[in-house]
């Protein structure tokens, strides 16, 4: 049986980049589902997809307007949006071998046959950095945080809370998980709603919920980047003694977290793209406005199989839009 793959895109801006990502993933074995942040108008995202794939039938299945969520960075709202996407794919009746969460400003790095081959395996593309049982990251769960409540944000991290009696782990939000792993997560959350209640006022629960459930499951040995037992003070620090001191690989993504004080990864540029292409990542984030995709020579004329940038040859630094 030919495997199928579900892609979930969380989008909140840059409809043209979102549409280019959708177009780059257009394949008979891939179904794309999208959640557009309720804070923005979803119509430009629909229109952008129709513009790049005018002949395609349902190239994207969007979360319905009534089900969209206003997403706030660091809040449980991103977990809720991910669960809406999972519910939408479950409702389709289709069975998927793998489920992947992407951002609307992600860049596909590999040719589709290579992507399909990687997705057909059984590894859980997930990065788990640390257990939240001690150290500075414990403050993410032992104090109240209010990213989804603007009027209370000034109190975030100031109010202690009762201990959460669960073994908790933290890692990168972006994941690509087998259907077995997604099934474990879905059943766990259905059987124990306390998971989401306990982490509702954590900081960045999107980096905790799925990771913690899988680390306590039979799928834990299949997690591709499990660094929870490493001894380190700061999981982003490039001088860590841990083998995970490469802070650019996060599950299936290249994300440059080499700045230990950074609060957001920098936009992708040509040099970062070269590093991403030379590594194992399948996707990179995040691409800036004006970047379009995803095939053709590198800017200096260096052509290589699988190169996914599109740039003109007129001397302009602006990427050129290439349609396939």
How does the language model describe each region?
Residues 1-306, 315-324:
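ER/Golgi luminal nucleotide-sugar-dependent glycosyltransferases, focusing on the catalytic module
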């Amino acid at each position: 049986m030919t495997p199928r793959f579900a892609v979930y895109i969380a989008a909140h801006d840059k409809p043209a980049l979102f549409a280019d990502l959708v177009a780059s993933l257009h394949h008979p074995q891939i179904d794309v589902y999208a959640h557009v942040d309720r804070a923005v108008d979803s119509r430009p995202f629909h229109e952008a997809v129709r513009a790049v794939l005018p002949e395609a039938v349902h190239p994207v299945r969007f979360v319905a307007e009534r089900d969209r969520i206003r997403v706030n960075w660091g809040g449980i709202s991103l977990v809720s949006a991910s669960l809406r996407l999972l519910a939408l794919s479950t409702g389709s009746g289709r069975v998927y071998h793998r489920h992947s969460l992407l951002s609307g400003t992600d860049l596909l790095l590999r040719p589709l046959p290579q992507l399909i081959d990687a997705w057909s395996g059984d590894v859980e593309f997930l990065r788990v950095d640390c257990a939240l049982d001690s150290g500075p990251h414990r403050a993410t769960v032992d104090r109240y945080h209010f990213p989804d409540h603007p009027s209370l944000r000034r109190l975030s991290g100031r109010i202690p809370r009762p201990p959460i009696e669960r073994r908790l782990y933290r890692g990168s939000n972006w994941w690509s998980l087998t259907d077995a792993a997604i099934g474990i997560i879905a059943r766990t959350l259905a059987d124990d709603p306390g998971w989401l209640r306990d982490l509702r006022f954590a900081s960045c629960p999107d980096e905790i919920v799925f990771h913690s459930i899988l680390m306590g499951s039979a799928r834990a040995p299949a997690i591709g980047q499990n660094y929870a037992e490493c001894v380190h003070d700061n999981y982003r620090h490039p001088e860590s003694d841990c083998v995970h001191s490469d802070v650019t690989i996060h599950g299936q993504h290249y994300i440059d977290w080499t700045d230990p004080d950074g609060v957001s990864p920098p936009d992708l540029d040509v040099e970062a793209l070269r590093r991403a292409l030379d590594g194992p990542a399948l996707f990179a984030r995040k691409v800036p406005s004006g970047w379009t995709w995803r095939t053709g020579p590198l800017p200096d004329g260096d052509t290589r199989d699988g190169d996914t940038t599109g740039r003109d040859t007129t001397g302009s630094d602006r990427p050129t839009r290439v349609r396939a």
